[in-house]
Amino acid sequence: MKKISNKCLDLVKEFEGCRLTAYRDEVGVWTIGYGITNSDFKITKKIIRKGMKISKATAEKWLEESLNKKYLPLVLEYDKQYNWDQNELDALVSFCYNIGSIKQLTADGTRSKTVVASKILQYNKAGGKVYRGLTRRRKAERELFLAKAAPEKKPVKKKSNETIAKEVLAGKWGSGKERKKKLKAAGYNYAAIQKIVNKLCKK
């Protein structure tokens, strides 16, 4: 299951800002923390109203839960078409948190990633007016979207103790303390392997 990373959290925090006392936003909606509103009641379990205060830890907890439970699924709806890498996923969840959906951005999954990246910049208006903050945010999201994500590490399948014991006898792991150090560093049970080595030597 794909998840957001700290890159997404940091991006959202940077542009949303954090206010620990409830306030009304530009359109009169009660808001608190990193842009949390009463539409997030399933997460907060509280009604946001005048005079409400929360801690920074609560603000961060609510943000992370909102991103993972509410907005990540909206981005993953299109994962079959796009197979988002980590950076693309993080950028789009941030976008979705601000805009509410990526359906229009992706033309319901019909646009290429290249076109999606170019279209991100167009969402810098509110009420038909261009906002500098939204322009900066869209540029940051597009930059993250286009950044090459680190390749996913595939787990290395460990060899059996019997196979390693035979390699030890063949001299592949050195001898004495050096062998012990190498085996432990590779995550093998030195004592168990040595026991098998001793048995093989007696045959």
Model-assigned labels for residue ranges:
Residues R138, R142-E152, A186-K203:
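Repeat-associated, polar segments at repeat-unit boundaries in modular proteins
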Residues N161, L169-K180, Y188-Y190:
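Extracytoplasmic Gram-positive cell-surface binding/anchoring modules and repeats
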